[in-house]
């Protein structure tokens, strides 16, 4: 009998608990495939975009396209300034690029298994990378081609990509390799930290966007705000933005940016250079044939006439003339070799810059004609925009955007680095070589011996290092700027705070750091176009609000082109022609991937779109399912009509049901605004609706779907929950033993929620529990629950409610950064120095190897490891000579346990131990001041652990775990929490997992009714209320109390991490105020609210203590007369002799210099003569006093004086110097007489 085949893992999930099945999957991970395909699909865009760089399926990869784009570079020998004729020519190009999987370096002779897995890189705090190498091909004077290979450094590899050892591993294999059973991948590991390239929203590719920007007027005289922008994308995913500007005299200029410089060219010159054409052809191309309606449009014909007339001044008519003219102007800009003629440079300019999506490698005449037609269409749309016949395209709408994927951006950086290596580094080292050896030609034996090794060695070949820098900092160092609006903020740390946080990173889409600084809020608005593509709920509050969005959970991103080769033929069969008119009522454009296929009437256009869609869904005639068919109908001043089809990558698509065939169709953001898609089956309008949503929750992100009954809540509360779900102290990972994160939070007593959406199981969130089911009573009890505080049952706390731990990793390295690489220069080693005296307490803490014992409790000041200095003796052995043992100590104030000690070896395996990584566990039981929240944005602080004996109890003997105040609900309108409480109670009584998917209930079929009947069946009150008895008096409460089961989350904001105490400590040198920062022992800030509270309490004198005495109290001399700090100075008494001691302080401003007084009798002088430090003598200025002022005030005074502003203070007269005699009037009444 044949052995039974293993059954494939079932991937279907429902809303039930499924605990046994989940536990089996966890204990015996499947050996065939994942049980949670939806979870793996969430990360697909990241992995697939990286895989596109190095394909192994025979199709050309993105880097193959990039190498073809870089092309062949030419170098000449001899004198640089001499004429190129008669010189030898060296041509060199990249033939291929190879990336190896991660391996131990060849210098390591000890390793048996040479593969390096990601888990090892995390634990060793190093980067997960492979060797990058390039094969070059060169010829001398068109001779035989020769090849050589150069290594380009170590390049970071994306986890689970096609260059990673974990690709296509089953869950069982992943567990064996120390990963999660459901390891997602999609990130890089740099220095042991998981880094992710975030997805960015950019302009839609190959589509002319009509925009109005007031800043366009600043480009020069007669420029207007009108323009057409086209972000044109090459096959290797690099882009070049082309802009057409409308000038007030009817002219149009073509603008582009090259290596961060902008250039403007008349659009007529580009057209004349592309094809051999004449004025009539251009006129008819813009306006239409003589008999068409477009000719009647005088607005258009007048401007086209001006466009043609003003170009006459250049005197360039033929294609050859125009290309040579462009080549002459752009020769230096493009950096082309001297051997190229002006005409060839012009051709190169058109290839590299003008509408590159229509041909950027070996451009044919047909492709040039396509570029010409596209420019005509862009001019036509620009004139329509100016005339008001077409609306402005909104660049902030998802309809006009696409996503720049991490892998594609990574590929763009690799391409640019490869090009820089040839055009900059290699060119410089070759030039340097030729200068040092002026007599050597490319054909000489000396050169053939030195090339390529001696010349390439001087070039900076380490591309891997610059990629690692990009990933670790997120900063882009690029000479071209890669056609992006930002240079930083491209990468984020994929934090595993909890699993929800981790998965959200991969679905995050950012608008770009440039928009974060804008003062306008238009870019942040939630627009209806993003329905089903971007989640309307899941965006942070605060500064990134609306800029950092998350993809809806069903939204997919295309990572490769679909085959649209039959579309052009089908379009012509359906009635598309080549003749067009400027009047959109007569003809509209049919475009595929930014190439004009042809033109047709608006009526034909609609039927072509409907026919293609039917074929597409039915899989007929080779129309791919993921093709986007963006039909824009004609309108009165609306969007420019046409049929815009797209088959290229980086598009968002989402599944909906196509009603005529009842099959799945994928729609894109450009076609959706003009389609009729019903939300539910009941809303389908016969004869109008073409599609219906599979599920109304498809518009929400993964995390927003986890909020139970979110349709019952006020919208901001759902947004808050999306943030708080990501700040929960949950279960970050199951492979905790193989992670060395700087800080990791873990909840020890996690539970599966009773109330949850079916997606909770689909995504396998039960493997990473995020909270606990708590019995919650809504009652105002004891007053400790005011202002969102919550009371916790002390017994629940003792049973482990919310108990968690923090894991911290401390790395101790003895390596000295300045030391060289040879092993002989090791100067420190772990362990005790021989013959040194060691305390008994230290012996208890450390083992004989000088490392801490696992499981030991550490307190502040305890030793965590011992080391001693070493040097090599005459045998090369490392010995200690001074007999002194040095210790590293634990500096944190919190007690911790040593969880794990890792000894980390060197790459080559020959060095003694130099680095250890110690993981510490800090238990964190909930204490007063820790933050908790329900799944409805109802956050609160634990205010008291109330003894169980004093807690209220129900008739069935149930005591609540948590008590919250009823005032938390009315203003916040979180009705979802009431429903969850009912559902959780019913679910707990019947042993059911309750489905909390939103939009399930309506006015006829209410949630209260549904769950109320379940409660009645269990013998409880229909409304969820119960009579409770006071735990203190034992009497029944006057009112019934609402009590049920709610899933509670413990947030990571704990009072132990936040409390701040300070008496005296470091101050800011300039102001004298306490520094800020808890770590540095800084002060606690008293702001305006605190000030108002103290004033309201009638304790205003406390304010003086807080804001002056405890802050920057200082005593300072001041002149009463002129009211200034700045003019006072200490005097020097002239009679003390050589010591010249400082005596009193005088005001220099009010005093008179003795030398400036004429005929003065020293005996008659009224006042004291005093001397300053330089020996000058003065009289007067003694009206000074000491005042108490804040140090910051003196600093402000000096700063303002530097700007020429003088501050004058009035001093209270209470302590003025008394002069004259005292005359008594009445007893006890004193009066001052002058």
Swiss-Prot record:
Return the Pfam families for the record. Answer: RNA_pol_Rpa2_4, RNA_pol_Rpb2_1, RNA_pol_Rpb2_2, RNA_pol_Rpb2_3, RNA_pol_Rpb2_6, RNA_pol_Rpb2_7
Indicate the transmembrane segments per the record: none
Q: Which UniProt keywords apply?
A: DNA-directed RNA polymerase, Metal-binding, Nucleotidyltransferase, Nucleus, Transcription, Transferase, Zinc, Zinc-finger
Q: Looking at the keywords, is DNA-binding present?
A: no
What is the E.C. number?
2.7.7.6
Q: Please report which protein family the annotation says this sequence is part of.
A: Belongs to the RNA polymerase beta chain family.
Record-given protein name: DNA-directed RNA polymerase I subunit RPA2
- Lineage, please? Eukaryota, Fungi, Dikarya, Ascomycota, Pezizomycotina
Q: Which gene encodes it?
A: acr-2
């Amino acid at each position: 009998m044949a052995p039974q085949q293993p059954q494939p893992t079932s991937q279907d999930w429902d809303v039930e608990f499924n605990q046994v099945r989940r536990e089996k999957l966890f204990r015996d991970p499947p050996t065939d495939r994942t049980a949670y395909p939806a979870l793996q699909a969430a990360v697909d865009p990241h992995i697939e975009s990286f895989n596109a760089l190095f394909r192994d399926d025979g199709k050309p990869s993105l880097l193959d396209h990039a190498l073809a784009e870089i092309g062949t570079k030419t170098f000449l020998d001899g004198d640089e300034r001499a004429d190129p004729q008669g010189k030898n020519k060296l041509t060199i190009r990249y033939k291929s690029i190879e990336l190896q999987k991660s391996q131990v370096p060849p210098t390591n002779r000890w390793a048996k298994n040479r593969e390096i897995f990601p888990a090892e890189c995390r634990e060793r705090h190093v980067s997960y990378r492979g060797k990058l190498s390039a094969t070059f091909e060169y010829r001398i004077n068109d001779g035989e081609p020769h090849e050589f290979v150069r290594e380009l450094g170590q390049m970071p590899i994306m986890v689970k990509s096609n260059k990673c050892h974990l690709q296509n591993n089953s869950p069982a294999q992943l567990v064996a390799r120390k990963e999660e059973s459901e390891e997602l991948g999609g990130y890089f590991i740099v220095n042991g930290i998981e880094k992710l390239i975030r997805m960015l929203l950019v302009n839609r590719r190959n589509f002319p966007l009509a925009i109005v920007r007031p800043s366009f007027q600043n480009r020069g005289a007669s420029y207007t705000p009108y323009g057409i922008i086209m972000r044109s994308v090459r096959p290797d995913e690099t882009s070049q933005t082309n802009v057409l500007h409308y000038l007030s005299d009817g002219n149009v200029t073509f603008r582009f940016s090259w290596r961060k410089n902008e250039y403007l060219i008349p659009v007529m010159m580009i057209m004349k250079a592309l094809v051999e054409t004449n004025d009539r052809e251009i006129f008819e191309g813009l306006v239409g044939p003589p008999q068409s309606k477009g000719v009647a449009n005088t607005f258009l014909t007048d401007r086209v006439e001006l466009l043609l007339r003003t170009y006459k001044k250049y005197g360039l008519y033929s294609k050859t003339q125009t290309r040579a003219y462009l080549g002459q102007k752009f020769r230096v800009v493009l950096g082309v070799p001297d051997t190229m003629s002006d005409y060839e440079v012009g051709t190169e300019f058109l290839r590299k810059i003008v509408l590159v999506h229509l041909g950027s490698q070996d451009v044919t005449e047909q492709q040039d004609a396509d570029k010409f037609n596209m420019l005509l269409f862009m001019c036509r749309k620009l004139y329509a925009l100016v005339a008001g016949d077409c609306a402005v395209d909104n660049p902030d709408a998802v309809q006009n955007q696409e996503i720049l994927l991490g892998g594609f951006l990574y590929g763009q950086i690799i391409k640019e680095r490869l090009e820089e290596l040839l055009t900059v580094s290699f060119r410089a080292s070759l030039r340097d070589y030729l200068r040092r050896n002026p007599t050597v030609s490319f054909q000489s034996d000396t050169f053939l011996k030195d090339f390529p090794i001696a010349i390439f060695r001087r070039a900076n070949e380490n591309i891997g290092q610059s990629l690692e820098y990009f990933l670790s900092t997120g900063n882009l160092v690029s000479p071209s700027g890669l056609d992006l609006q930002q240079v930083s903020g491209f990468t984020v740390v994929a934090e595993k705070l909890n699993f929800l946080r981790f998965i959200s990173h991969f679905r995050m889409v950012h608008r770009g750091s440039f928009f974060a600084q804008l003062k306008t809020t238009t870019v942040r608005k939630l627009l209806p176009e993003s329905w089903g593509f971007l989640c309307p709920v899941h965006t942070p509050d605060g500064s990134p609000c609306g800029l950092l969005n998350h993809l809806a959970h069903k939204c997919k991103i295309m990572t490769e082109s679909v085959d649209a080769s039959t579309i052009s033929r089908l379009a012509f069969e359906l009635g598309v022609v080549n003749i067009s008119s400027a009047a959109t009522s007569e003809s509209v454009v049919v475009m595929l991937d930014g190439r004009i296929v042809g033109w047709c009437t608006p009526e034909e256009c609609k039927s072509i779109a409907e026919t293609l869609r039917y074929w597409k869904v039915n899989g007929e005639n080779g129309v791919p399912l993921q093709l986007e068919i963006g039909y824009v109908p004609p309108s009165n001043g609306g969007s420019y009509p046409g049929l815009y089809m797209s088959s290229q990558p980086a598009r968002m698509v989402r599944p909906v049901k196509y009603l005529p065939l009842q099959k799945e169709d994928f729609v894109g953001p450009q076609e959706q605004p003009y389609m009729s898609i019903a939300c539910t089956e009941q809303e389908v309008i016969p004869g109008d609706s073409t599609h219906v949503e599979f599920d109304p929750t498809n518009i929400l992100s993964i995390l927003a779907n986890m909020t139970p009954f979110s349709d019952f809540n006020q919208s901001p509360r759902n947004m808050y929950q999306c943030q708080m779900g990501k700040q929960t102290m949950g279960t970050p990972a199951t492979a905790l033993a193989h992670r060395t994160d700087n800080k990791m939070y873990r909840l020890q007593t996690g539970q599966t929620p009773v109330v949850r959406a079916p997606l909770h199981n689909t995504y396998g969130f039960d493997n990473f529990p995020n909270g606990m089911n708590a019995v919650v009573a809504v009652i105002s009890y004891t007053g400790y629950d005011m202002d969102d505080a919550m009371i916790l049952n002390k017994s629940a706390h003792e049973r482990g409610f919310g108990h968690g731990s923090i894991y911290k990793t401390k790395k101790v390295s003895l390596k000295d950064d300045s030391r060289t690489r040879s092993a002989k220069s090791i100067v420190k080693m772990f362990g005790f120095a021989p013959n040194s005296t060691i305390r008994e307490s230290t012996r208890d803490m450390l083992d004989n190897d000088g490392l801490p014992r696992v499981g030991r409790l550490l307190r502040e000041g305890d030793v965590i490891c011992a080391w001693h200095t070493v040097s090599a003796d005459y045998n090369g052995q490392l010995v200690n000579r001074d007999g002194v043992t040095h210790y590293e100590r634990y500096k944190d104030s919190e007690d911790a346990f040593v969880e794990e000690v890792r000894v980390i070896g060197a790459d080559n395996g020959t060095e003694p131990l130099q680095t250890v990584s110690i993981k510490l566990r800090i238990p964190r039981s909930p204490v007063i001041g820790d933050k908790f929240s329900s799944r409805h944005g109802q956050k609160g602080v634990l205010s008291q652990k109330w003894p169980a004996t004093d807690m209220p109890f129900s008739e069935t003997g149930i005591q609540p775990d948590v008590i919250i105040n009823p005032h938390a609900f009315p203003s916040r309108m979180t009705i979802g929490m009431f429903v969850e409480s009912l559902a959780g109670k019913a679910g707990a009584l019947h042993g059911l997992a309750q489905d909390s998917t939103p939009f399930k209930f309506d006015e006829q079929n209410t949630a209260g009714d549904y769950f109320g009947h379940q409660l009645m069946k269990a013998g409880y009150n229909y409304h969820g209320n119960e009579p409770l008895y006071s735990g203190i008096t034992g009497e029944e409460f006057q009112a019934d109390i609402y009590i049920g089961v709610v899933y509670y989350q413990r947030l990571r904001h704990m009072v132990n991490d936040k409390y701040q105490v300070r008496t005296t400590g470091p101050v800011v040198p300039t102001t004298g105020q306490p520094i800020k920062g808890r770590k540095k022992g800084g002060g606690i800030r008293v702001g305006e609210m605190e000030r108002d509270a103290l004033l309201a309490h009638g304790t205003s004198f406390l304010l003086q203590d807080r804001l002056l005495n405890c802050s920057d109290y200082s005593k300072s001399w001041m002149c009463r007369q002129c009211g200034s700090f700045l003019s006072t100075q200490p005097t020097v008494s002239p009679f003390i002799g050589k010591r010249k001691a400082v005596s009193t302080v005088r005001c220099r401003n009010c005093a008179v210099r003795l030398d400036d007084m004429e005929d003065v009798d020293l005996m008659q002088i009224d006042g004291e003569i005093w001397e300053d430090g330089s020996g000058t003598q003065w009289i007067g200025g003694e009206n000074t006093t000491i005042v108490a002022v804040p140090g910051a005030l003196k600093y402000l005074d000096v700063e303002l004086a530097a700007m020429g502003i003088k501050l004058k203070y009035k001093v209270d007269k209470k302590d003025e110097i008394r002069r004259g005699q005292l005359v008594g009037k009445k007893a006890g009444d004193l009066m001052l007489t002058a």
